[in-house]
Regions:
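Membrane-interfacial, low-structure loops and terminal tails that flank and connect transmembrane helices
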Residues: 271-297
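Extracytoplasmic catalytic/substrate-binding loops of multi-pass membrane glycan-assembly enzymes
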Residues: 223-225, 510-513
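Membrane-water interface segments at the C-terminal ends of transmembrane alpha-helices
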Residues: 1-30, 43-165, 189-220, 233-235, ...
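The alpha-helix within a helix-turn-helix
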Residues: 175, 462
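Glycine/proline-centered hinge or cleavage motifs at structural transition points of membrane proteins
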Residues: 178-179, 192, 465-466, 479
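Short glycine/proline-centered loop/turn elements that form peptide/ligand docking sites
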Residues: 167-171, 271-275, 454-458
């Protein structure tokens, strides 16, 4: 069983994750000619890679900085305060993690740039902001920035919330008893202990932003991030350029995850920074903290919620409302051809495409999740019981944060005609791609349940009473972690159902629903895209409700 599990892990997860790097080395002559020494354009492709990477880094760093400003106060509120609606607020924070990004990207686009969104509600004749609006200084398109903030915000909030909940409140209470304001207590006591959580959340959010593809394809306009560039170059058969860019992103993901593993292992330890403010500056800071604690408490608590509502809730409500407005005809021209029903059941027959795409998405999600479960369950026990388990767990973090377009290209090169030549683009290659990132999702969910219960103690008791190792696992261990298994199944299914970037590269003619949304937007079938986005968001809400019910048990 051990060897079979390790072989499956290597073949289905490890090899596809890192094959792209080996492909670059094996095909270095092609990469060198296409990227650095092209006989026609010289090193123009290398310049494009640098330009795209620089833009992606600016975008990701800007989004993470914004997330930290508003995410830290919200994480503190969720971790330390009790109030009505707390569970609902946590669900809203979690929603972007399970929402198909292409549908969410389209909802955001409609909300801010068209008269069907906020602009129409305010009585404007156009959208609230033009699509080409750019944020000064960082020079990043506003729409892309909003989408990346919404999709990375949960990584900051949820990671830091968990870290704060694990910190004992004794020192905070002592600080408050001695007369320190809440902000001073946070700065001197809680912040040093929570810095590893802030650091790990920031790295995960940065990596998520760097690899985001589905929503960015919808709102990017003429801008191009690293993930979008890989999709575009693959479609143009510039495999050497795309693989070189993808390998750079894989290496970046690996470099980012190593410090996270180090600091996440510092349980209960503060990250000490050898820096002290001058006394005069410190007095000024404390005066500001006293004023803010008295006057700005409500602003501090409610501003992050406003950000969450504007970036997550409002786009969902707008796209739902748009389906109603456009149901039978275009509300502004009165033309039936501009209605949802006509585009779904008329000559374009998008309903038939949606039905086929739904069937494909469900098959891919179910099969990939089932295979992932078969690998992940025994792999979880190996991680907990073997010395090399910590290495496996660290490696499993890479597929979670690697840009999905890089992952899709790696799988295409590994199993396709440029590699083993076993599978061509289509549903089975999509399934193999989804297995790579589904296994870590399931493993992390089961590990959370395993580490939260005394599985080993109960299993040892069963072995003492005469049970075999297999019977002990079947009758004792698995029932104890069944909640984690079920949660992992749902999260994996939801992730697979909404994945866009990698799917675009490997799907061939077997289109999934998220990819269909992108195709609809590119074809200007906006009412059909309204309906399909609403359909995807509704599915994610149902899955989130199921997760909430299962985790409460």
């Amino acid at each position: 069983m051990t060897w079979a599990t390790l072989i499956a892990f290597i073949v289905f997860v490890l090899l596809p994750t890192f094959y792209l790097i080996s492909y670059v080395f094996l095909s270095w002559n092609d990469v060198r000619v296409e990227v650095f020494e092209n006989p026609i354009i010289g090193d123009e492709n290398w310049k494009q890679i640098q330009k795209v990477l620089f833009f992606s880094f600016r975008l990701s760093l800007s989004a993470v900085a914004f997330d930290l400003i508003f995410g830290i106060p919200l994480a503190y509120v969720l971790a330390r305060k009790r109030f009505r609606g707390k569970d609902l607020l946590e669900d809203i924070v979690t929603l972007p993690l399970v929402m198909p990004t292409s549908g969410f990207g389209f909802a955001t686009l409609i909300t801010w740039t068209t008269v069907a969104g906020i602009g129409g509600f305010l009585g404007l004749s156009s959208g609230l902001v033009p699509l080409d609006t750019v944020i000064p200084i960082v020079n990043v398109p506003l729409m892309v920035f909003i989408v990346h903030v919404a999709l990375t915000f949960p990584y900051i909030v949820r990671t830091l919330e968990t870290k704060i909940q694990s910190i004992d409140t004794t020192f905070e209470m002592a600080s408050r008893t001695l007369g320190a304001t809440p902000l001073t207590t946070f700065r001197n006591v809680l912040l040093p202990l929570a810095l590893p959580g802030i650091f790990s959340g920031s790295v995960l959010a940065f990596a998520r932003s760097l690899g985001e593809t589905g929503a960015t394809l919808i709102v990017a306009g003429v801008s191009s991030t690293a993930s979008i560039a890989i999709v575009r170059w693959t479609a143009e058969f510039k495999l050497a350029t795309a693989s070189f860019m993808g390998s750079l992103l894989v290496i970046i993901a690996w470099v980012l995850i190593l410090p996270v593993e180090v600091y996440m292992g510092r349980r209960g330890k503060a990250l000490r920074i050898p820096f002290h403010l001058p006394p005069s500056v410190l007095k000024g800071v404390m005066r500001v903290e006293r004023y803010a604690s008295r006057k700005l408490t409500r602003v501090k608590d409610f501003t992050p919620i406003v950000v969450l509502v504007l970036t997550v809730i409002v786009p969902i409500l707008v796209v739902f409302n748009s389906v109603v407005l456009y149901w039978s005809a275009d509300p502004y021209t009165g033309k039936v051809q501009g209605g949802v029903l006509y585009q779904l059941f008329g000559p374009s027959n998008y309903f038939n495409l949606l039905t086929k795409a739904t069937l494909t998405s469900i098959i891919v999600a179910l099969v990939s999740t089932y295979i992932s479960m078969c690998i992940a369950i025994p792999l979880t026990f190996l991680i907990e019981r073997k010395r090399y388990g910590v290495i496996i767990r660290s490696v499993l973090k890479i597929p979670l944060i690697i840009p999905t377009s890089s992952l899709g290209l790696s799988v295409l090169l590994l199993w396709g005609s440029n590699g083993f030549n076993l599978i061509s683009s289509g549903i089975w290659l999509t399934i193999l791609t989804h297995i790579v990132f589904s296994v870590p999702v399931v493993v992390e969910s089961i590990l959370a349940a395993y580490e939260g219960s005394d599985v080993q103690m109960y299993e040892d008791s069963a072995r003492t009473l005469g049970a075999t190792a297999y019977n002990a696992i079947e009758t004792v261990s698995l029932p104890l972690v069944k909640g984690g298994i079920l949660t992992g199944f749902i999260l994996s299914f939801a992730h697979s159902l909404g994945e866009t970037g990698a799917t675009f590269i490997v799907m061939g003619r077997d289109i999934t629903v998220p990819a269909l949304v992108v195709n609809m937007v590119e074809a200007l079938a906006i009412p059909a895209a309204f309906f399909t986005s609403t359909y995807l968001i509704a599915l994610s809400l149902i899955l989130l409700a199921i997760i909430r019910v299962t985790t409460r048990r």
